């Protein structure tokens, strides 16, 4: 799975209408491209991962999903260790907090596959215990 950039491509305003129009068209193109990349990232998940994503979506990301004893809905400490990648800490609306959700049911302990859900509605996937993240929503 390809890793998606975590930057959100913001642009400033310009007083020139032709320049502003050009920038607006560029922003639409960039947003469409960014959204397509997120859809492509989601589509690269395995069927099991997509199924679990849909179960969490249906439950409103409120913790455990039916038949799934796992660690779901616990606080994810963004940048909490030296080996962890760092997710965006803020957006235009303020601070973003994150919760983690296991993907696989294991008999003992936990594996490295997780969804990380942001308070801004974003969802990231990691299969290497937070070393890398791919945005899927």
Label every model-predicted segment:
Residues 1-78, 83-84:
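Low-complexity, glycine/serine/proline-rich disordered segments
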Residues 54-137:
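Functional cores of ribonucleases/endoribonucleases
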């Amino acid at each position: 799975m390809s890793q998606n950039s975590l930057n959100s491509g913001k642009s400033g305003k310009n007083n020139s209408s032709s320049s502003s129009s050009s920038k607006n068209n560029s922003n639409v193109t960039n947003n469409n491209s960014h959204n397509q990349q997120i859809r492509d990232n989601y589509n690269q998940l395995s069927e099991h991962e997509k199924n679990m994503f849909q179960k969490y979506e249906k439950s409103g990301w409120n913790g455990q999903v039916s038949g799934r004893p796992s660690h779901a809905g616990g606080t994810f400490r963004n940048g909490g260790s030296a080996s962890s990648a760092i997710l965006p800490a803020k957006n235009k609306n303020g601070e973003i907090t994150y919760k983690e959700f296991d993907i696989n049911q294991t008999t003992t302990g936990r594996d490295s596959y997780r969804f990380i859900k942001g308070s801004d509605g974003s969802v990231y996937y990691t299969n290497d215990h937070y070393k890398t993240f791919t945005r899927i929503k």
